[in-house]
């Protein structure tokens, strides 16, 4: 039990205007419902809008549960605002959020610490119409989006022309800066970290295509195997990498690290893809699922995240 005062004024900040707005609304509703069910008497749901600072100034919360996903709630913007206002908030601070949302910056921090990540290059979307940035197959993803928004797998002789033609309707067309990475064969896995401790490994098995936005948030489109059926050494390695990434980036509260594992290469085939500092808290989300596997109910998970936000030295 967290021992939190049930009279704390908790504002659950959700919604916003990113491509992940719908997910944020689901996460926020789940958090607010759980707090109310656990006896918290002052829970306010706040839909993120451009007057958010004025609203928070009126509400004067003791703590904000940041249930936003994508910009501006996951890139350090909202975190910086809350720091300036002197309001405690959940999850990672301003600098960590700004680094982790940018996949190129994340690599710059983690790779020197020995964390294996795919080698890639940043390209602008217009250059794709001149030719492929690297040999196929490769993955294209926006530099600073989450939830697999805008991700495309470009295959040899496959889905988007050769070179990508101006007529190709690829998801990259909505973004200026893209990260191109070699496609890594194998299995999709993820590790949640809570309070600095890795919980377990989940394998994600989409029933069609890859683990994109729809597969993540549509019930029945992806099988979650939790805990993943992988050798203990592989699970330990992934959990160690996730905990290290959480620490080196300076994450707080909960984070989630996504991996690809080429199982033909053993431990040498483990690649960290990205670290999510604002992981989903919906009914289908992976952090609550792994918490349940560890015997932590959803409501307790929410309280633990808030308790860390209110701990001495945790602000921002």
Report each predicted region and the residues it spans.
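A short glycine-rich, hydrophobically flanked beta-strand micro-motif that places a catalytic Asp/Glu
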Residues: 44-49, 178, 182, 252-264
